[in-house]
Amino acid sequence: MKRLYLRKISALLMMCVLLITALAGCGKKAENVSDNAATEAPTATEEALTPTEAPAATEAAGPYYSADASVESVVTDAAGKGMVGNWGLGNEYEIQALLTKYNQPTTYLSQAFDMDGFDDDSILLASAMTYNELGLVKNSYDGGYGYGDGVKYIDMNDEGVAMLEDNIFTTGKFAKENPETVKAFIYASMKGWAYACANPDEAAQIVYKYGSSVSADHQAYMAGEVKKLVETDMTGAAVTNYGNMDDTAMQQTLDLAKKYIKLDDSAAADKLQTLTLDDIRDTSFFTAAAASDGKFTPEKKDVSIQLKWLPQAQFMGYYVALDKGYYSEAGLNVKIVPGGGDIGETTAVYTGQVDFGVTWVSNLIAAKAGGMDLVEVTQVYQRSGLVLVYKINK
Amino acid sequence: MKKLRSKFNRQTITTILYPVLFGVLIAVLWQTQLLHKIIGADTFTLPLPKRIFGIITDNWSNILINVRATVIVALGGLVLGSLFGYLLAIVATVFPKWGSGGLTIASAFNAIPIIAIAPILNNLTKDFSKDPNIRSMFAKMLVVMITCTVSMSINSYRGFTELKPFSLDLMESYAAKKTAIFFKLRVPNSIPYVFTALRISVPACVISALVSEYFAEYVIGVGRQIRENIVLAQYATAWAYIAIACGIGIVMYVILLIVEGVLLKGRR
């Protein structure tokens, strides 16, 4: 019995020793690794990052940027240091367009789905959605970083590199076979969005009720910001026709997509360059839904919609339409399928796992170029919600 | 003798021929789209081999950059992890009372999923270097190292301790010192076990390198390309990188088998 006890203690001791040696091992390896990596670096970054001198104005008062620094000086400095962050995976095109606008290489750091990289200064110019990450950075509620006025941001809409984001899409085949279902779904969804924008606080509560990935406070903040994206276009003008597909904004999105979506598959890359607005969107369903009296005879009653991300106020219109019974009034039985992580909403819709999906127009264009028969039927967000946030010197 | 050799040859021929024939059969079924009918896929999610091969040849220089990054991480992690594992086994042999128990606990490290440790190590190595490429490569190597350490330490510990019957008694009857026993008996005895460990570690190091790239700060590597292309619905390109990833694993395994065959000739 005593021996067993002894053995247990010695095992514990051994574990401590192992841990310590493991940690010591980590330190020792440092030299090897940097050797390897140093030789790798020049080839890995094709577009060599040539460090540029930070503008004097930004360096004078502290480690960050002065409150009145120009967009160009901030972008040039951060890109020169190689510290511009984005999530990648199809979210990077607006950032690359902005970097190109200021003659910078289009490489960026891979940003995690939190703002820790921005917080610990490994990313100077971090991507953020106005309705999500920007709120977390500024506010000090649960999960927030509490920077308040200590940060400023660069708006893609102001810079002329905005691309359209959240829309509603389906497959060309589904739209052709179930036109009434598509119209009914658009009608009820946009009715939900209209209500949500008129009552953002209530909409936030409804979303929270249906299973939220974030706190109630953040949900309320998000609803307020999402409302702005639905009600304002890229030029800042008010939009009353919710869900309208504006040709100018759509064309700008397509043009930027053609320039910045890089596809290794030559067949897909060629197809991307030939795409026109008519290939990616069909306005007929939206026009018909807007003109209708709200009575539909859907061909398929049980439909589902795949969200691009976790349940949050970004998708409040759908949750409101479900909660207020707008979908059932239109003769539909709707199931909302949350996304998250690496769920490809385009693939889910294309393979028929779900009938509708919410995605960014650029992702739809990439999928279309890859050979998926997808078509946008409504454009919910009228302007880009993507910003680049940076800290300012106090 | 002659009969034996011909028998041996026939055996090696069949062991190579059958898998190759099976592979060719699958490739033919795949290209003729019969495979798609059997498993109910379409040519979009499962593109034809010809198209995949075309993408590989079109983007060869770009692919090489990613392959290089992945191989450096995999090999670096494999070497570091194996050396560290061997060292742990030596420590465990020198202190036999703690040794076996300690190694059992160490093997618990093997149960940590790569997906869980990769982002954590990413955050822990933020201060390592100012260059994101270097620090993210370091983080990736640590992930690979953790997966390679355990199999090496457990296997080589067995090699150090499970000696041939009476060989230890013989050495002791010669009044051999402990160091002599260690270098003349234990170390040579551990070599086949080292290769057993490597047979596990080599495929594992490629897999963990690919997965760690998913979460790395710096966008590079075969694994990262697979993820990007699948999310962007570029399945043909994703399949091209999957094929490359398989190639890396197979080539490294074959190299290991050849080295093992040369070094352990006549020992097995």
Language-model-detected regions and their locations in the chain:
Chain A
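Bacterial N-terminal signal peptides that target proteins for export
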Residues: 2-13
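Bacterial N-terminal signal peptides
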Residues: 13-22
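Bacterial lipoprotein signal-peptidase II cleavage site
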Residues: 23-35
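Short, glycine-/small- and polar/acidic-enriched structural segments
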Residues: 36-37, 41, 47-48, 54-111, ...
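Pocket-lining segment of extracytoplasmic ligand-binding domains
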Residues: 111-213, 355, 362-363, 392
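Secondary-structure end/capping motifs
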Residues: 177-263
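Conserved C-terminal helix/tail region of periplasmic/extracytoplasmic solute-binding proteins
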Residues: 250-300
